[in-house]
Every structure is written in structure tokens, then in C-alpha cells.
């Protein structure tokens, strides 16, 4: 065999491999795989991976295999932008994530400018979808919506209690706390103390002293499990019996690990329990086979992959993200593991739903 023939065969083989790689549909996952909220990133990672495995076993999307490419944002906006640029540089057109609002907002700008569609499973800040970006969707509700659920509960059941509102200064935490504050103020409750903590701090004694002086009986915390768990513990160590409330940032098992028995009774809002939805059966079985709990963030990430799949199939294109976005905006229902979803013009869920959950002896239970 001569050298020219060998070269021709080698070139043909290269083209063949390139075509095979190109045939795969790559979905990027931008999530905090390291850093203070890595526990949530891990849930999203596992949910997306499991959804892709199930989809590929069923023949993929339009006959093409789906692969994931992960980019770690560490829960930091600047690193999130770097992760987004990495995704863009790799020519990826679809993304699950980011996980936190503070990262999702700047990342959405980068992705929008470069024609990449994103479906966040967990970024709940209203600002994310309020800017009219055609490429942004989510499989979760917004902070203002979930804050109203908890505020309604407080107004109906704790109107005679002294309520304090605390946040972690972040886009998610402050947004959630401010939405809760506005809702209870509208309903006739004025908070006895409004304050903030700095992520990473360990000693909240000065804040606890202020809360104790104010006679706070209920403390709403907008933020994540690390600071929330420490605050819960230090409140009780100071002899306070204040009930801690919050959003889905307190839903991770690390909240209980940090707060210990002091976290007993903490109430938080989160998406309705998808495991009670018949549509979740296949997803739950797939997760159970891998010993993965069907937690809210995991299920939302699973559904985010399903949303991208539905959009690609409706658009009839595996690489035209604008066509896929248009297809998702058509108002038609999308069947997912967390139920039937439809999207508004902004990329928000048309009918989001939240429930209130409680920490009880280290387990999460629905509020009866």
C-alpha cells in the first residue's frame, strides 16, 4: 500500500471520527462542582447525568446520542462567566444551569450573546428572566413566588409573632428575603429586625444579640445551608427558641449536619414534591438504581434535560438554538419528570408551584 493511499485512508478516518463526534448532541452543564454550594451542584450533576442515560437508552434525541460537558462555576459569578466562555468556545448550543442566581445572570448574558440556550433547574431570582432574553428558561419558580407562599403561611399562622428578616447579601438570598419582607409588610407585619450576614463568616454572635434584644420569635433567612445552619445553631445556643424559616437554600442535608438538633422544626419552601407525581416514576427508578435520592434539585435538573430534548424535537434541529427557544415559547405542554410544564414569554413557568417543608429529626417532611 503506497503512502498516498495511506494518507487518503487516514484523512477519511479523521473525517469519519469528526462526523461521529459532531453527530453527538452535547449539552453543557454549568454548576458549582466545588465551593460552598457544591452540594447543590452535585445534585444537579446527578440529575442531568441520569436523564441523559435514560434518553440514550431510549435512542437519544432524533437518533443522536446525548453527551454532557461539565463546567465548574464554584458558585462564583466570575468563574461562571469563564465557564460560559468555555462552553461557547466548545461550540455547545444548549446548557443546563447555572444553579445560583448570582452566577446565572451574568452567564445568561454571555450565552445570549453567543446563541446558546440555557435551562436553569434552580436559579430562582426574578431578574434572570426579567430582561427579555429569548434563550433563558427555568424548571423552577421565582423567589418572589416562593416568598409569597411562606409569607402567606406566616400571616395566617404567626401574625402575633415577632418576625426578623436576615439575608446573606447574595442575589438569591437578599432577593428572597426582600420578597418575603415585602409580602409580610403588605399583610400587616412589620419586621422587628432586618439585617445581613457575610457568606463564609462563622460567628454570628453580634447578630444573635440584636435578634435576642428585639425579641425575635421567627427568623426568616434568605441564603444557603452553611450560614443558615450556623445561624440556627447559634440562635439556640443563646437560649432563643426562634423558629427559622427560609427557601430551598435550607433544603440540603448539610443544613441539618451544621445546625444539628437546633435545626429541628425549620420550615422552608421548595418546589412541590415531584416524587408524588406519577410522571416521576421512571426518573425515580433510574435514580434509585444508582442510589441517588430524588431531591428537588436533582429532579429539576433531570427535567431541564427533558425540556431541551422536547425543544430540539419540536424545532427539528439539533444545533439551531434560536429555533429550539422559539419552539419552547410556543405554549404547548412539555411532559417532564416534575410534571407538565409550559413557558411564558419570559421563559418562566406558566404555573409554578411551591410547598412548605419541615426539618424533622434529620429528615425532610411535608408540612401538614
Swiss-Prot record:
Gene3D superfamilies xrefs: 3.40.50.2300
Any Pfam family hit: Peripla_BP_6
Signal peptide: 1-23
Top-level taxon of the source organism: Bacteria
Entry keyword set: Amino-acid transport, Signal, Transport
Transmembrane segments: none
UniProt cross-references to CDD domains, sorted A to Z: PBP1_ABC_LIVBP-like
GO terms for biological process, alphabetical: amino acid transport
Keyword Manganese: no
Role, per record: Component of an amino-acid transport system.
Family: Belongs to the leucine-binding protein family.
Protein name: Leu/Ile/Val-binding protein homolog 3
Biological source species: Brucella suis biovar 1 (strain 1330)
